[in-house]
Amino acid sequence: MAENDGETIVPDEQCNLTASTPMKSSGLEQVESPKERKTSMVECDDEGNPSSGTPDESPKQLTPHSIPPRRRRSPRRPEVSASRLPLKVLNQIFQYLPLKDLRSAMLTCHSWNNALSMEDSDIWQYLLGKKLPEAAVSDPFLLAELGSAKKKLRAWYFAWNTSDISRNNYIRTNGFTVHRQPVAQSTDGVRGKRGISKGVHAFDITWDGPLGTVAVVGIATKHAALHCVGYVALLGSDDQSWGWNLVDNVLMHNGAQLGVYPKMNNPPKYEVGDKIRLIIDCDTHVAYFERNSEFLGIAFNHIPPLRLYPAVCAVYGNTEVTMVYVGSPQMG
Amino acid sequence: MSAEVAAVEIQEAPVAAPIMYKVESNDGTVFEISDEAVKQSNTLSNLISTCAPEDVASMDPIPITNVTGNILKMVIEWCEKHKGEALPVDDDSVPKHITVPEWDTNFLKIDNEVLFDLIVACNYLDVPGLMNYGCKMVAMMAIGKSPDELRIIFAIPTDEEDEAAERAAKEKAEAEKKANAEKDAAEPSTSK
């Protein structure tokens, strides 16, 4: 009863748990396809240039120019070759390449990888200036923790998905903050642009504005619903999503409550504006949270090997949630 | 009548006689480049900016110690072709976009190794126009290719090939050392 005092509208007792996502399946598949290709780029970044990242070679014609024969060259002769071009020259060549080709260039040889690993070089500054909205670049706090242009560009590719979102949510012009409109008797969610299936990934999530009766952060497959009628902890209500309701600190999965988190007596309530870090370890199939850099314990384990997206669901009108991808968290 | 003829002669003089500067490559070949063409290279322009025109004829050639003769010849040929043109100004498109004219496309249809030498020479001589075209040509070879394809196109050895080459070089050095040791061992027995 006390929880309802802050609500202007009393929620119905009946809830429609079978509400379907407003997205069309064909639309989802279209959105999914480019993500598949881009995911390997970030995985390579996280894993430090793994050999398994090499794609298959296609039989198509390689170049309109004649290909010089692969002559063995003594490693001691300092001849100019593509792999020994000066850094300034490499940067000029890479400025003509789109992002996908920059990934191929990073995997070609060490010197090219070194040139493109300088995360504040002109190439990444250019791409950052063109890809990110002005509202994100000019916000001094939004991406403050990301130290390089390349990391900020990467965060953009993981931000909230403008085409995979409940109809009552919209994404602000900075591209990283979702805003829930004041609609009665509705639970509304959003997914990130890109899912993850390998490696360890961290997302910084900040809830601005009141929580209401439901404020869930967690992970979801692409099949999890993002909308339903009523005020429901939608994230975690089925086997496609896992959620942590910040209002009562309860973990949810497959419609079942998994207990209070952090697992202690009277865990502290979420303070609006605190930074929550969601960490998904796909290799050991666990997910957990940190709050203001403090580890809170394992939240979910035995997560199936699916492609998982960061997600939130909200019920309070005009509340906002910001999510910034930070890559692999620093351990220890 | 004679005054008119004299005026015409005076007017024609500057057009007929461009100042020619001499540059020397690292293999001793001397080339000439006109004062208009020199402006395409910021490095050369800075070198000659303090030279009085009347002293040019008696000057020694400007030594360019890290560019070979054939590459320097190509750079000068390109500069002569584009003399009088403004230096390119970078737009801020991403990826960078530039259109390579037909003459320059044909000019740059050369072996990849020569193209890379040319680009490095442009980097040193600071010829931004040819630098842009050369880098664009290399980038066009790279667009849409996988890493394996890039290694084939640009003759970049993989780590395994590098290790194999180093191992072969090491074995060769050891074999030479062994042969020398045997030779040294043979000589004392002969002297005995």
Curated annotation (Swiss-Prot), chain A:
SMART domains: FBOX (SM00256), SPRY (SM00449). Pfam families: F-box, SPRY. Residues 138-330 form the B30.2/SPRY domain. GO terms for cellular component: neuromuscular junction; neuron projection; presynapse; SCF ubiquitin ligase complex; synapse. Its main location: other. Gene3D superfamilies: 1.20.1280.50, 2.60.120.920. Residues 1-82 are annotated as: Disordered. Keywords: Synapse, Ubl conjugation pathway. Component of an SCF (SKP1-CUL1-F-box protein) E3 ubiquitin ligase complex composed of cul-1, fsn-1, rpm-1 and skr-1. Interacts (via SPRY domain) with scd-2 (via cytoplasmic domain). Interacts (via SPRY domain) with convertase egl-3 (via C-terminus). This is F-box/SPRY domain-containing protein 1. It comes from Caenorhabditis elegans.
